[in-house]
């Protein structure tokens, strides 16, 4: 499996963020996007996720589902946790599982995998910032998709939470998955760097 972008141009708010950008990541590989603030790291993740449309260029996934858009074969974990405060941990995760569709796994397994088994019935409003982040990470587990797009994924996680997430990323890569991440802190796994924008 290979995820690639060719001659990508991104414009936001009338400003060109980048042009002529190319990238490539193979199954089992983590690609870390590096560059100064505003260089377009988050914009590239959002292009791959289908949340933005490129002004030019193409994004393809060789070895994926041929009739399924790349965006529907990717998970995007952004800055915000996108949780409904009044819903429980289990209900929030169930909502995302049903919304995302595809091949599904057991909710309880996903909740336990991120260390929230004791809080499955607790409303999200009562979770700490780190627990909310763990619940967002659980979305990656209950619907299997080969591409993980991660924007500052370890924000709000304590050391134990970061170690847990490292294990989940390692398992995803071992299954042949792809990770593309924008982060200011090390992911804790081997990565290949992709510079976005001019070197600083």
Swiss-Prot record:
GO terms for biological process: cytochrome complex assembly. Coiled coil: none annotated. Its main location: membrane. One of its GO terms (cellular component) is plasma membrane. It catalyses: heme b(in) + ATP + H2O = heme b(out) + ADP + phosphate + H(+). It is a peripheral membrane protein. Its EC number is 7.6.2.5. SUPFAM superfamilies: P-loop containing nucleoside triphosphate hydrolases. Gene3D superfamilies: P-loop containing nucleotide triphosphate hydrolases (3.40.50.300). It is found in: Cell inner membrane. One of its GO terms (molecular function) is ATP binding. Keywords: ATP-binding, Cell inner membrane, Cell membrane, Cytochrome c-type biogenesis, Membrane, Nucleotide-binding, Translocase, Transport. Residues 3-200 form the ABC transporter domain. It holds the Pfam family ABC_tran. ATP binds at residues 35-42. InterPro entries: AAA+_ATPase, ABC_transporter-like_ATP-bd, ABC_transporter-like_CS, ABC_transptr_haem_export_CcmA, P-loop_NTPase. Belongs to the ABC transporter superfamily. CcmA exporter (TC 3.A.1.107) family. The complex is composed of two ATP-binding proteins (CcmA) and two transmembrane proteins (CcmB). Part of the ABC transporter complex CcmAB involved in the biogenesis of c-type cytochromes; once thought to export heme, this seems not to be the case, but its exact role is uncertain. Responsible for energy coupling to the transport system. This is Cytochrome c biogenesis ATP-binding export protein CcmA. It comes from Rhodopseudomonas palustris (strain ATCC BAA-98 / CGA009). The gene is ccmA.
């Amino acid at each position: 499996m290979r995820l690639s972008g060719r001659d990508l141009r991104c414009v936001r708010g009338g400003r060109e963020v980048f042009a002529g950008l190319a990238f490539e990541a193979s199954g089992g590989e983590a690609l870390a996007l590096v560059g100064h603030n505003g260089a377009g790291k988050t914009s590239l993740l959002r292009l791959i996720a289908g949340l933005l449309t490129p002004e030019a260029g193409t994004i393809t996934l060789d070895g994926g589902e041929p009739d399924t858009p790349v965006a529907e074969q990717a998970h995007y974990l952004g800055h915000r946790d996108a949780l409904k405060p009044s819903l429980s941990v289990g209900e929030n995760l169930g909502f995302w599982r049903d919304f995302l569709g595809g091949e599904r796994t057991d909710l309880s397994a996903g909740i336990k995998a991120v260390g929230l088994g004791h809080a499955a019935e607790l409303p999200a409003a009562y979770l700490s910032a780190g627990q909310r982040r763990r619940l967002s990470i659980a979305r990656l587990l209950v619907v299997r998709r080969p591409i993980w797009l991660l924007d500052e994924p370890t924000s709000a996680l304590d050391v134990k939470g970061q170690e847990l997430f490292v294990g989940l990323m390692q398992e995803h890569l071992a299954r042949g998955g792809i990770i593309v991440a924008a982060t200011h802190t090390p992911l804790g796994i081997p990565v290949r760097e992709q510079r976005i924008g001019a070197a600083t």
